[in-house]
Amino acid sequence: DGGGGTVWDSIVYDEVNDSVIFGVGNGSPWNRDHRDAGKGDNLFLSSIVAVDASTGTYKWHFQTTPGDNWDYTATQHIMLADLTIDGAKRKVLMQAPKNGFFYVLDRQTGELISARNFVQTTWASHVDMETGRPVETPQARFAEAPSFALPSPFGAHNWHSMSYSPETGLVYIPAQEVPFVYGKDPEFKYAPGYWNLGVDASLAAMPEDQAVAQQLAAMIKGRIIAWNPVTREEAFHVEHPGPWNGGMLSTAGNLLFQGTPLGQFL
């Protein structure tokens, strides 16, 4: 048994369509095998959902990570914007959730306009634009053996706010790459009042082999990514010493501000 799907961050109001749009969290336990023997998509986990603001009636949804298995929430910040795409003005929403893909959706219908990874993703190669589903790699669900993965449960982007500048047309994402090893917990039993992950978290510990540990440590990165949502590519990035940096502020004077875990204000 299981559940999850908490709405703990982004909730926005779209006054044009009189919609409340919110991002939905991960599955609990993380490992879908402990939630759903049928191995379904588990709606509405890891989804963006729109409801009528006046009645609460469901309008549409888009699921970023069907059958979530990795703690890949879609609760990260939802931004509303007007973008010119293929010569047409579109009223869109944008999100860079934990799973490492940057999404642009039509905010009236939920239609997927674009999706592309903004960091390295080992769990999925790309998003199928016909179905909107990520194309998972063979080892992604760690069904037979533990799987090395990027992003980790920390996410490619977490609760630290991204920002959008209409002046530059860029979205500024406090992104990170933190490797993780997912594997089944063969002794998992649900325990009320505890984190019920259903994965063996000890697999993610740093190995005793110092050479391997140093190699893994070198893979841990934090950066500002300036993302162009129209061309679907990175415009530039700024490297940080490590991950878990603060939210972004962009100004009309084309300045960027951000705090770091080391107490610096940039």
Identify the function of each model-found stretch.
Residues V12, M79, S163, L249-S250:
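Conserved beta-strand position repeated across blades of beta-propeller domains
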Residues D9, Q76, H160, N245-G246:
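Structural signature of WD-repeat beta-propeller blades
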Residues V16-D18, R90-K91, T168-G169, G253-N254:
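Short coil/turn segments that connect the beta-strands within blades of beta-propeller domains
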Residues T6, E15, L43-F44, T73-T75, ...:
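Short, solvent-exposed loop/turn segments at the edges of secondary structure
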Residues D1-D9:
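Solenoidal tandem-repeat scaffolds enriched in leucines and small polar residues
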Residues V12, A145-F148, F154-F180:
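Long, low-complexity segments enriched in small/aliphatic residues
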Residues F22, Q95, I173, F257-Q258:
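Residue position within the beta-strands of beta-propeller blades
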Residues D1, H34-A74, A81-K89, F101-A149, ...:
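Extracytoplasmic/lumenal domain signature
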